[in-house]
């Protein structure tokens, strides 16, 4: 499903599975056919399979993004934030992942496939270039009885492990995400997740805008929860579907 300059071959595709649970109750399985002919695709497959104890297992659907407001709102994609650090969980041991510890080597894959339909899976590899770069946040702290201004570093850029699954065409993702595959089984599971109630997005509230402009941490925490499902949606298991052995000439149908 990738386009020129390179045509994906059938043997390049690997199927990855994700077993979904809502509040610990099994919901169903999603299977994604991934093009391993790209660096981004190989990275996604490795994280689905697991490397050095690091994988998408136990990560969550963190947001259900929508377009429009109120009764006109429509769900456009599910978002997973990926893994925070390239280390074995519970330790400081670094893990080597295909593509390295950042998204830099994945950037050349941008634009090879548009987010023009439902069921496309893509890695988040950079911030939206149309938005301003985040700046360090100033805050006052008391040092030996005096107030001093300190600056918290801005959030890091995407590390190329978070991903989205489209629920309809989402061309706004073309500037930030690299398509690595498509859902080939479990569309009904996607639909059930998309209908879950989420935390209301209050970015249009003047009170929120003021709080964010002055660096109020409560506003920053609240913003991270916008469009988050009220119920925990988790990838309980994930991995790679074993490929069937090709039929021999004697076994081939006549």
How does the language model describe each region?
Residues 2-254:
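Cyclophilin-like peptidyl-prolyl cis-trans isomerases
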